[in-house]
Amino acid sequence: MASNGDKGLIVSFGEMLIDFVPTESGVSLAEAPGFLKAPGGAPANVAIAVSRLGGRSAFVGKLGDDEFGHMLAGILRKNGVDDQGINFDTGARTALAFVTLRADGDREFMFYRNPSADMLLRPDELNLDLIRSAKVFHYGSISLIVEPCRSAHLKAMEVAKEAGALLSYDPNLREPLWPSKEEAKTQIMSIWDKAEIIKVSDVELEFLTGSNKIDDETALTLWHPNLKLLLVTLGEKGCRYYTKTFKGAVDPFHVNAVDTTGAGDSFVGALLNQIVDDRSVLEDEERLRKVLRFANACGAITTTKKGAIPALPSDAEVRSFLEKK
């Protein structure tokens, strides 16, 4: 799909990998009769989500100089994502993840990264011109786990911020990748006060606050003065939003979920694409609620197919879905 050249650029930083998804839901990895190869990785999913919706996006990260790595770069290009920020590592493989799909479409992960190419991105390999051209710079926390990628992440954030980009953060907690829960929490929170938009899931809210109450009081313990929008996604219960001046909830759409992979990324991509050229939406509750309803629809549609990227909807698909609701 051709990207809209007039739109502001959304640059997504981090990992892209291959998810191996069982062909049968509700079985363990050992019992799975076969696996479907599905490209994924939250930051890459967000970049493709933006492009599918008619926006402009670029991906910054490192892939293995192997068949899987070149396949993933090709998928980004095919989906209209700028690939000038991609590096290839000749010494490390592209990351793999085996995903267990429970009967309700939710997931558990087993990762193969020892180390994978994405972990080896160095600050001197960053395409700084591309990063400086971002109107929105989006990232997760997996790139904070080890050096040198952590330093590359911090440098990219700093360069984007100095150039005037809006910083967007989705921690995308994957506990098995961290040395410990304490380290995960420390590192996720180490860059917390830099982001102007933060999206967490209900599970991440519980993890970061230590509270099992998913309510406004708990969510607002994560508020910081630089924030423009804090979002808590509640899966089949919709989402909650918090700004400096207002807060509220947006109802979900009920669909037959088969795989929740990529739903949060689809939600984030939709949100960023709607605000990249008009940040005033963040200060207008009525308009923000419309944007979040659209984002909820994107997330819901994404759960109705297996794999993240194949399931990310186009703008026309979302509008058609909303017309029927």
From Swiss-Prot:
A GO term from the CC aspect: cytosol
One of the GO biological process terms: fructose metabolic process
Keywords from the named record: ATP-binding, Carbohydrate metabolism, Kinase, Nucleotide-binding, Transferase
Keyword Cell membrane: no
Pathway annotation: Glycan biosynthesis; starch biosynthesis
UniProt cross-references to PROSITE patterns, sorted A to Z: PFKB_KINASES_1, PFKB_KINASES_2
PANTHER family: FRUCTOKINASE-1-RELATED, HEXOKINASE FAMILY MEMBER
Family the entry assigns: Belongs to the carbohydrate kinase PfkB family.
Annotated protein name in UniProt: Probable fructokinase-1
